[in-house]
Amino acid sequence: MAGFRPVDDVLAYLAGGWRVRRSVRDLASGAAGTFEGTTSFEPPDGDGPGSAWEGLLHHESGLFEWQGVTRPAERTLRFLPGGGASRADVRFADGRPFHDLDLATGRYVADHPCAADLYRGEFTVFDADRWRTVWRVGGPAKDLVLTTDYTRSW
């Protein structure tokens, strides 16, 4: 993986389905876990909640294993058009801001302050069908690294 793939249109690049594999490490305790599942990036439903905005609805679902216990997990985000085709404004499902994203160079670092914690995400695009995020979460009670690999499935 010797370089980054620039992305001219971030929403077009993300659209579709992805297989997801995530490792979660607690650097303070040494605990580790995994998530495996799928992520879809699709236009919002025309008649349901969220139909008043443009962009893509990101829905992730799968199984999260932590300290020997496996349970279902899911999350939803909104990827809205940003200040250019390579940019997106990423928001939580309820519309609160999460972070900006600009994949014009194929790599981007975003920060999200959350109370006393700081979430720093590094986004890397390898090719048309593979990308990765690495989130480092630090704060008084958190010292985590979450590494997620996405592989296009449709």
Which residues are covered by each model-predicted region?
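Soluble ligand-binding/transfer domains with enclosed cavities or grooves
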Residues: 2-154
